[in-house]
UniProtKB/Swiss-Prot annotation:
Subunit: Part of the 30S ribosomal subunit. Forms a tight complex with proteins S10 and S14.
Keywords, comma-separated and alphabetical: Ribonucleoprotein, Ribosomal protein, RNA-binding, rRNA-binding
Family per record: Belongs to the universal ribosomal protein uS3 family.
Family annotation (PANTHER family): 30S/40S RIBOSOMAL PROTEIN S3, SMALL RIBOSOMAL SUBUNIT PROTEIN US3C
Keyword GTP-binding annotated: no
Keyword presence, tRNA processing: no
GO cellular component: cytosolic small ribosomal subunit
Function statement: Binds the lower part of the 30S subunit head. Binds mRNA in the 70S ribosome, positioning it for translation.
Designated name of the protein: Small ribosomal subunit protein uS3
HAMAP family (alphabetical): Ribosomal_uS3_B (MF_01309_B)
GO biological process, one term: translation
Domain KH type-2, chain residue ranges per copy: 39-107
Taxonomic source organism: Photobacterium profundum (strain SS9)
Gene: rpsC
Length: 229
């Protein structure tokens, strides 16, 4: 059976940036990695209602800098910045070094795979029909300029006895093209029948990296030979 490689992992360093950027020696590496995991888990739990897209972690000179990408920055910041200050203090306690928090707003949540997946999962938990939730997400993404989108759900759909998976696609989703900017994310819906998994692929266009593109040269018209009389 053909298996698919992770669309984000294969594009790291080509069109996708890393979510964690730091260097450490062998003694500190495990502690930093464990700290990053705990910080991410804490933020996912705390900012469940803030439409959290992704968390980028940097570690410059014995400190930690966390960039939170969210569609609702107001919820993260809180009244007069109280909530973000609590987050900063807790992250500093987890990491054991001074922490700095930056907040980046996601302008188009309909084109962010993680936010689309979380939205579908939330609808499934509220007993919305899975086909309706999938089609609505696909239509919104295409309306806002996506080149293609694919949504897949799997589990006991509609409370069925036998689990199955269904998918819906519109436009192009070229997984084999490395320069294709494909946003991929997963989410899960906890329903009374069990867990339903959600996968989302969004194709936003091709990244050509500033390389000059040579246009095909037009063929020169051939000279017609004069016939001998």
């Amino acid at each position: 059976m053909g298996q698919k490689v992770h669309p984000n992992g294969i594009r790291l360093g080509i069109v996708k940036p890393w979510n964690t950027t730091w260097f450490a020696n062998s003694q500190e590496f495990a502690d930093n990695l464990d700290g990053d995991f705990k910080v991410r888990q804490f933020l996912i739990k705390e900012l469940k209602k803030a439409s959290l897209s992704r968390v980028v972690i940097e570690r410059p000179a014995k400190s930690i800098r966390v960039t939170i990408h969210t569609a609702r920055p107001g919820i993260v910041i809180g009244k007069k910045g109280e909530d973000v200050e609590k987050l900063r203090a807790h992250i500093s306690k987890i990491a054991g070094v001074p922490a700095q928090i930056n907040i980046s707003e996601v302008r188009k949540p309909e084109l962010d795979a993680q936010l689309v997946g979380d939205s579908i999962a939330s609808q499934l938990e509220r007993r919305v029909m899975f086909r309706r939730a999938m089609k609505r997400a696909v239509q919104n993404a295409m309306r806002l300029g996506a080149k293609g989108i694919k949504v897949q759900v799997g589990g006991r759909l509609g409370g069925a006895e036998i689990a199955r998976s269904e998918w819906y696609r519109e436009g192009r989703v070229p997984l084999h093209t490395l320069r294709a900017d494909i946003d991929y994310a997963t989410s899960s819906a906890h329903t009374q029948y069990g867990v339903i998994g959600v996968k989302v692929w969004i194709f936003k266009g091709e990244v050509l990296g500033g390389m000059p593109i040579e246009e095909p040269k037009a063929d020169k018209p051939k000279k017609q030979r004069k016939s001998r009389k």
